[in-house]
């Protein structure tokens, strides 16, 4: 269902005539990372699950692009971004697919509806002076595409201009031709 976003990111990267750094937070099995690597970007892939990061590495190897520039990191995404801010590292694009709910190693509770604003605000601080895109995916019931679009618009358009869009994402059912809704996406782009 997220292939539309992978294609969007790859196209934006290919059309830009400069080296690009992309941050993929909550990167799971790495499909977005691979799309960006294949398009020519340097990618930083972050996920808290060691197994998911290993799977993403295997997907890169199976795709024949394991030699492309990428950092594979097993880390808490929020803590990683906080360190990147202190280090002064910047990215030209951010892709994030945060979970709806989770618990940290210390029992901390993560609820996307309560922490999305602060997460995007934090991530905004690692965007370069000339960012290309910010892609936000969600499978959280009750977090509509319109709310996600508004959030990106409020937090990013004032400083970076550009435009914001949102949509439901889903999978087309071959038997019926209907689309099975799977989640929401919002995109800020230059």
Residue ranges and their predicted role:
Residues 131-190:
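C-terminal catalytic and target-recognition region of SAM-dependent MTase-like enzymes
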